[in-house]
């Protein structure tokens, strides 16, 4: 694996490398789009659609939908910004990176509200309040941990790289940790999604738990997980290959040297 991502280990010519990048990029968009499409079909067709807190059972359906849209697809797109737009000015890429992560944060918060409302406002068949205890499953424990880590990553990244005035040496010191934790959180998101899909299927899909057969609902949920994993793999291949890493433009190199010299003289 270390050899695969060694920038000095070159098998493909530059034109072949660019072609491979584009192929994996297209595959990532197809897999990510299918994951979003299928989770929407799963929740709208097989799980009775969407509503807000007037119908907690339907409000829950926003949870997996928004998590796939935000924490999987938009998170992955945010990671890809510096690869897809590696020949654009850094200010453009950085702004788009922050916008996408901010959208992820919004989707994440709405998804969390949906699942907590579902638990807290749950009613029994007679219509009486029957709250479900929060945070008891392994999925919820790991999911909450991922949410906290993501929020911390967002705050640290925003202050360090988007908020003006942070010294360049500090940015350089934080960067490898920022990149590493971003990738790790993204991987754990995919794992958490798989756990959530399995948990929901075990509770709600009676075709295989009681009838012992595959059904469209179960197949749809399983394909959501498959395409989530495939999207994750494609994003990681694109992000971890140093050959596709964004390189500073000539004008940015000059500005960096001027800024560094000014900092040293101070």
UniProtKB/Swiss-Prot annotation:
> Which InterPro entries does the record associate with it?
CYB561/CYBRD1-like, Cyt_b561/ferric_Rdtase_TM
Chief site of localization: membrane
Offer one Pfam family short name for this entry: Cytochrom_B561
Residues holding L-ascorbate = 90, 94, 171
Positions binding heme b 2 in this chain are 83, 90, 97, 178, 245
GO CC terms, sorted = membrane
Cofactor dependence: heme b
The keyword Metal-binding is assigned to this record: yes
Alphabetical keyword list: Electron transport, Heme, Iron, Membrane, Metal-binding, Translocase, Transmembrane, Transmembrane helix, Transport
Q: Which residues lie on this side of the membrane: Cytoplasmic?
A: 1-22, 83-95, 163-176, 241-266
One GO MF term on file is:
oxidoreductase activity
The residues listed in the UniProt record as binding heme b 1, with positions renumbered to this chain, are: 63, 134-137, 139, 199
Per the UniProt entry, what is one GO biological process? ascorbate homeostasis
Can the keyword Iron be found in this entry's annotation?
Answer: yes
Provide the protein's localization: Membrane
Q: How does it sit in the membrane?
A: Multi-pass membrane protein
Highest taxon of the lineage: Eukaryota
Note on cofactor: Binds 2 heme b groups non-covalently.
Q: Which residues lie on this side of the membrane: Vesicular?
A: 44-61, 117-141, 198-219
Quote the PANTHER family the UniProt record gives: CYTOCHROME B561-RELATED, LD36721P
* Protein name as annotated: Putative transmembrane ascorbate-dependent reductase CYB561 homolog
Which species?
Caenorhabditis elegans
